[in-house]
């Protein structure tokens, strides 16, 4: 069992692993023979998933519940890994939170929660684990962003801004680490059938009317992210429709793009 970088058995740490894209990514890595460290806030779901994956694929799967939005959570997680003599070869930063609605109607607490997890937590994980990968001369990083990273999204203003940060940081880090043996991939999915989407639909009747062809299959999205990570691809946008939308957005003048996305946001988000 290898990661394709010459090491015998690799360990993949996946945040936000208890459901959605994170859970599907955990299955992808387990299927490929990687040992797993699963991180999320939901202790019971995490432990059940670890047991299921260990039984199904015969890999070691460790559940380490943690809230990465909290100060000190990342160093504490690293200390727990050291006590278990676990070295992380693949880091998957998938944990994230979404809150939608007009900016002025959202509480400062909701805004800060997105920044604390989507930006600060992810950055802390990179700062904690990337130096060791570079020192060892091998490693893979998969950061999960969104197609919202490519354009302003009124009604998802802060969320889109956090994902733009993830995209920019990932691209910059990929170039910084080129030639080091450590690769950086950023996965930018569109709307995907996850518990996060289900929660958003409950809060927005308009979202419930989205046609099925606009909603990506979570396992297919995860499979694309896994393969892109293994291939060392820098940016992966799953799905032809999302790829076309991203290209169209980049070719559209910014002022017009803001108007278009704003109009869509006012009617569907």
PLM features per residue range, with description:
Residues 32-49:
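Conserved glycine-rich Rossmann-like NAD(P)H-binding loop of the short-chain dehydrogenase/reductase
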Residues 146:
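Residue(s) in the substrate-gating loop at a strand-loop-helix junction
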Residues 102-103, 110-115:
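Substrate-binding pocket helix/loop in short-chain dehydrogenase/reductase
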Residues 18-19:
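Conserved glycine-rich cofactor-binding loop
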Residues 43-44, 65-76, 108:
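The beta1-alpha1 cofactor-binding region of Rossmann-like NAD(H)/NADP(H)-dependent oxidoreductases
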Residues 186, 208-245:
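C-terminal helical subdomain
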